[in-house]
């Protein structure tokens, strides 16, 4: 008897060792694949081409970009530009209307905005806004945007973004609540480390994507068949139908990396843990598995075999499953499953009733369970290729009593965490303020969608897995007063219900002639969109006289009182100043309501910022001409008591070869008896901001706000930075990447500003006079207008030019008094012969001719 037991034990040990060797060989093969992948990834161009060939998915792009960023540490200017270029390339090839519901695509957009914030914070706001519009259902997109605004000192804007995220139903809600709480506590980080850990699990599970990407991870994502199978099983487990593309399993993926280290690293502002991270499984306690098992027990729907396998693996990880026995058979009936089999889980018992006397599983049973799992996995992988999309119909359930005395708890605290990512709501624009309708899957009760879960009954418990209604945050469509009012198309969309938020927001470069804007009864046809920023958009339009104008549209529904006041100031300043100078952009018409503002303005060819980016080298005469235009425009606003305080290249536009000033959004009007004004907050662009606008000059606080002084000399500093950019190709402090270090360098007198030698000595002198930190010692606009650099320098040939001009006047004077063609021809021949012989002008004859003209 003992001999038989020894023989049986030896056979079991041999079997275990054999399986361990197989696993070891499998790991070695995967490591070899990873090394090959690393060699391939050394050539980024080849990697990008490979991504395009295998499907061009956001998951592959994010996997590549994270690895590229990890290898780019520490970050410098060249690497930063390279990263921004790669992220921009990814966004260009990934259409937002197709991947707007994809988490990996959202993280790519957010990370690009964060990198732009490092390089140029002014441009970063547009990228954050783009990410918010394209991927509004993800909470981390809104939190990242709010964190950026908070870092720029825009507390109200940050709070407004978080409130709007809650209204639109962004998930997970817990992340937004945490960010809102920290914002009210005046913390610098909206998601501290301890809060990031608490929301990481819910963030990953709410996505329910096979390639759950993390903003806080810089490791490669596993996109193997195993991960796709488990993620698909999780979605079936919670009542979601598998799309056909997820039911199919790729036989080979060149980006497979199944054994890479999974750890949470600070990447961006909202790091979370992956679903396949070891830390996640460590945190999976028995209570979560208990509730999951209880839910399976109450289900009357036949679930595929892969769902049962996933549940069995969860039990094994929690240490709750036995190697064999009736309880295990209740969980996974049958010993030889097939890929097409499904099982009734009606008789599954809650986990509390399973025999759990021992907290730890014995070594023999653990090895047996592991061998069964390996066998089941191999069969499941083969069966997944035949798996088809199932459409389970949930029968009406009557309330059931829990078999345990313990009150049921929701596995996840956020009721919106299980919103299926692949469900896109159908939003139809309406003129009223009602929320748009949403198409709900058959297994959902539309009336109970988005309700708060309760533990009173099973129905209340299941409500935590309902799909939340996404609220429309776009302006109501009005056929007579919206830039997106395509009258015929809009009526058709309202009838068919095919409009989406993205479709109602985006305007193509070559738009239809049906797109029009009505301003004070005048109709303007939209040609294209030429700019956007924040809540405003600029369109190139054609007026009724077939003249090209620009219309600036501002959405006021989400704007606070300070923003609305800034736009009203802009209109008032334009009306006031355009009468005194042609260097100010012209305002032809405007319309103001509580919902929007329309401004019909002069249309420029290109703004100065875009022009500088396109020009490799600037002609000295162009630079001098544009510099004089800027001085004249700023001099006019200073004469009318206005300090712009946010001058930058984007505030100037080129119109028919002349530079004109635009955008007075944050300008302030000074009183006649003052030389400076006190602002309630720091505004302006860091690269062009004067030191006195950064430093607390007043040493006083009002309503807990730091007040700073700005004066006309502050605009001189900004103009000097623009001229520095036009001369050297960068701003004086652009090479300093860290924003805090940049601010210190601007206000620190010990930090010397570099002025490399150039051929134009007067230009270098102007730069030195403008970039003086002490505003009292800084040059003024009138002094700059009289500076030798602005004046046209006389050339040696100027006297010769004046002589040629006099000769031309003489010739024209001889011809202008003649009437008959014969006289004109005779005089012309005489003049030609005289100049051809070198005789030149006869002054006496010229004077005589002038006297004859006077007598006539």
Curated annotation (Swiss-Prot):
Q: Name one GO cellular component term.
A: membrane
> Care to name a GO molecular-function term for this sequence?
protein serine/threonine/tyrosine kinase activity
State the organism of origin: Mus musculus (Mouse)
Task: State the name under which the record lists this protein.
Answer: Dual specificity protein kinase TTK
Q: What does this protein do?
A: Involved in mitotic spindle assembly checkpoint signaling, a process that delays anaphase until chromosomes are bioriented on the spindle, and in the repair of incorrect mitotic kinetochore-spindle microtubule attachments. Phosphorylates MAD1L1 to promote the mitotic spindle assembly checkpoint. Phosphorylates CDCA8/Borealin leading to enhanced AURKB activity at the kinetochore. Phosphorylates SKA3 at 'Ser-34' leading to dissociation of the SKA complex from microtubules and destabilization of microtubule-kinetochore attachments. Phosphorylates KNL1, KNTC1 and autophosphorylates.
Q: Where are the disulfide bridges?
A: none
List, alphabetically, the SUPFAM superfamilies matched. Answer: Protein kinase-like (PK-like) (SSF56112), TPR-like (SSF48452)
Reaction(s) the record says it catalyses = L-seryl-[protein] + ATP = O-phospho-L-seryl-[protein] + ADP + H(+); L-threonyl-[protein] + ATP = O-phospho-L-threonyl-[protein] + ADP + H(+); L-tyrosyl-[protein] + ATP = O-phospho-L-tyrosyl-[protein] + ADP + H(+)
Task: Give residues where Phosphothreonine occurs.
Answer: 32, 380
Where is it expressed, tissue-wise? Present in rapidly proliferating cell lines; high levels in testis, bone marrow, spleen and thymus. Low levels in brain, heart, lung and kidney.
What are the record keywords, sorted? Acetylation, ATP-binding, Kinase, Nucleotide-binding, Phosphoprotein, Serine/threonine-protein kinase, Transferase, Tyrosine-protein kinase
Q: Which residues form the active site?
A: 646
Extract the Pfam families matched here: Pkinase
Question: What are its E.C. numbers?
Answer: 2.7.12.1
Residues modified as N-acetylmethionine? 1
User: Which post-translational modifications are recorded for this protein?
Assistant: Autophosphorylated.
> Which residues does the annotation say bind ATP?
530-538, 552
Taxonomy, top ranks, is: Eukaryota, Metazoa, Chordata, Craniata, Vertebrata
Q: Which InterPro entries match?
A: Kinase-like_dom_sf (IPR011009), Mps1_cat (IPR027084), Prot_kinase_dom (IPR000719), Ser/Thr_kinase_AS (IPR008271), TPR-like_helical_dom_sf (IPR011990)
Subunit text: Interacts with TPR; the interactions occurs in a microtubule-independent manner. Interacts with MAD1L1 and MAD2L1.
Task: Please list where the region (Disordered) is annotated.
Answer: 837-856
- What is the similarity comment for this entry? Belongs to the protein kinase superfamily. Ser/Thr protein kinase family.
**Regulation of this protein's activity per its record:** Inhibited by the ATP-competitive kinase inhibitor, SP600125.
């Amino acid at each position: 008897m003992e001999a038989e037991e020894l023989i049986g034990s030896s056979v079991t040990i041999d079997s275990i060792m054999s399986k361990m060797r197989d696993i070891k060989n499998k790991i070695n093969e995967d490591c070899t694949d990873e090394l090959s992948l690393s060699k391939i990834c050394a050539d980024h161009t080849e990697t990008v081409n490979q991504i395009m060939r295998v499907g061009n998915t956001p998951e592959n792009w994010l996997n590549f970009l994270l690895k590229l960023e990890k290898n780019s540490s520490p970050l410098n200017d060249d690497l930063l530009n390279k990263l921004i270029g790669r992220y921009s390339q990814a966004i260009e090839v990934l259409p937002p209307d197709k991947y707007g519901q994809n988490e990996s695509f959202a993280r790519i957009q957010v990370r690009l905005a964060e990198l732009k914030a490092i390089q140029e914070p002014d441009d970063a706001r547009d990228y954050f806004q783009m990410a918010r519009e394209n991927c509004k259902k993800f909470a981390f997109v809104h939190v990242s945007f709010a964190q950026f605004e908070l870092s720029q000192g825009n507390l109200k804007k940050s709070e407004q973004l978080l409130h709007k995220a809650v209204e639109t139903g962004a998930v997970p809600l817990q992340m937004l609540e945490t960010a809102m709480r920290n914002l009210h506590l005046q913390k610098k980080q909206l998601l501290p480390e301890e809060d990031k850990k608490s929301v990481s699990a819910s963030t990953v599970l709410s996505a329910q994507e096979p390639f759950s990407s993390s903003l806080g991870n810089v490791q490669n994502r596993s996109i193997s068949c195993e991960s796709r199978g488990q993620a698909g099983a999780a979605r079936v487990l919670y009542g979601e139908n598998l799309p056909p593309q997820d039911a199919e399993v790729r036989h080979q993926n060149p980006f497979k990396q199944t054994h890479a280290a999974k750890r949470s690293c600070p990447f961006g502002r909202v790091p979370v843990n992956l679903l396949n991270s070891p830390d996640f499984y460590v945190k999976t306690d028995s209570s979560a598995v208990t509730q999951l098992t209880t839910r399976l027990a109450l289900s009357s729907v036949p679930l595929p075999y892969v769902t049962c396998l996933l549940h069995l693996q969860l039990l094994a990880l929690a240490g709750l499953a036995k190697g064999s026995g009736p309880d295990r058979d209740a969980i996974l009936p049958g010993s030889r499953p097939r890929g097409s089999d499904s099982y009734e889980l009606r008789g599954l018992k809650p986990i509390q009733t399973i025999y759990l006397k021992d907290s730890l599983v014995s070594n023999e049973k653990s090895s047996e369970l592991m061998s069964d799992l390996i066998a089941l996995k191999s069969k499941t992988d083969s069966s997944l290729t035949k798996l088809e999309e199932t459409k389970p119909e949930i029968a009406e359930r009557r309330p059931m009593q829990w078999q345990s005395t313990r009150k049921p708890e929701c596995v996840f605290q956020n009721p919106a965490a299980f919103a299926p990512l692949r469900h896109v709501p159908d939003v139809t624009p309406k003129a009223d303020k009602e929320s748009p309708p949403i198409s709900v899957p058959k297994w959902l009760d539309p009336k109970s969608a988005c309700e708060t879960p309760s533990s009173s009954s099973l129905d209340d418990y299941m409500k935590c897995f309902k799909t939340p209604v996404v609220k429309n945050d776009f302006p109501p469509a009005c056929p007579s007063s919206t830039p997106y009012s395509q009258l015929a198309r809009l009526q058709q969309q309202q009838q068919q219900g095919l409009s989406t938020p993205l479709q109602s927001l985006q305007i193509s470069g070559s738009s239809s002639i049906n797109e029009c804007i009505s301003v004070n009864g005048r109709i303007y046809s939209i040609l294209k969109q030429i700019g956007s920023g924040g809540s405003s958009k600029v369109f190139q339009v054609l007026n009724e006289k077939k003249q090209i104008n620009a219309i600036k549209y501002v959405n006021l529904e989400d704007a606070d009182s300070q923003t609305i006041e800034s736009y009203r100031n802009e209109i008032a300043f334009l009306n006031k100043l355009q009468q005194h100078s042609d260097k100010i952009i012209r305002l032809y018409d405007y319309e103001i309501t509580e919902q929007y503002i329309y401004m019909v303005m002069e249309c420029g060819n290109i703004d100065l910022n875009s022009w500088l980016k396109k020009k490799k080298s600037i002609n000295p005469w162009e630079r001098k001409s544009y510099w004089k235009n800027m001085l004249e425009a700023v001099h006019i606003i200073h004469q009318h008591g206005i300090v712009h305080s946010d001058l930058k290249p984007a505030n100037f536009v080129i119109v028919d070869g002349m530079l004109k000033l635009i955008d007075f959004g944050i300008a302030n009007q000074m009183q006649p008896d003052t030389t400076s004004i006190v602002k309630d907050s720091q505004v302006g662009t860091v690269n062009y901001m004067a030191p006195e606008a950064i430093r607390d000059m007043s040493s006083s606080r009002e309503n807990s706000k730091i007040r700073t002084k700005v004066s006309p000399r502050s605009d001189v500093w900004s103009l000097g930075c623009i001229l520095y950019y036009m001369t050297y190709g960068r701003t004086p402090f652009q090479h300093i990447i860290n924003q805090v270090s940049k601010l210190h360098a601007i206000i620190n007198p010990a930090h010397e500003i570099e002025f490399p030698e150039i051929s134009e000595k007067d230009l270098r002198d102007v730069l030195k006079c403008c970039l003086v930190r002490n505003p009292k010692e800084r040059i003024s606009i009138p002094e700059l207008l009289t500076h030798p650099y602005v004046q046209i320098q006389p050339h040696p040939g100027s006297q010769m030019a004046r002589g040629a001009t006099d000769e031309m006047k003489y010739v024209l004077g001889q011809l202008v008094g003649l009437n008959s063609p014969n006289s004109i021809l005779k005089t012309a021949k005489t003049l030609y012969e005289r100049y051809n012989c070198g005789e030149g002008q006869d002054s006496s004859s010229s004077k005589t001719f002038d006297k004859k003209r006077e007598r006539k």
